[in-house]
Design a protein with these regions (language model features):
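His/Met- and acidic-residue-enriched segments that coordinate or traffic transition-metal cofactors
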Residues: 1-58
């Protein structure tokens, strides 16, 4: 049986949060990776906000 809408969102929020946390805690010195992490933080946070809004509508 597949994962439903709500279960999917509830699993993805911590997954995205983990990516943000890894970027913030990593000892990154490569400028390209630093830039990538900034993009990851911005996009993943926006997606977390969107998923929370969708969950709130259920």
């Amino acid at each position: 049986m597949g994962v439903g809408n709500e279960q999917f969102l509830r699993a993805m929020i911590p997954h995205h949060s983990g990516a943000i946390l890894m970027c913030r805690q990593a000892a990154i010195t490569d400028d390209e990776i630093v830039k990538l992490c900034r993009q990851i933080e911005k996009s993943q946070q926006a997606e977390i906000d969107q998923m929370k809004a969708i969950l709130a509508s259920y």
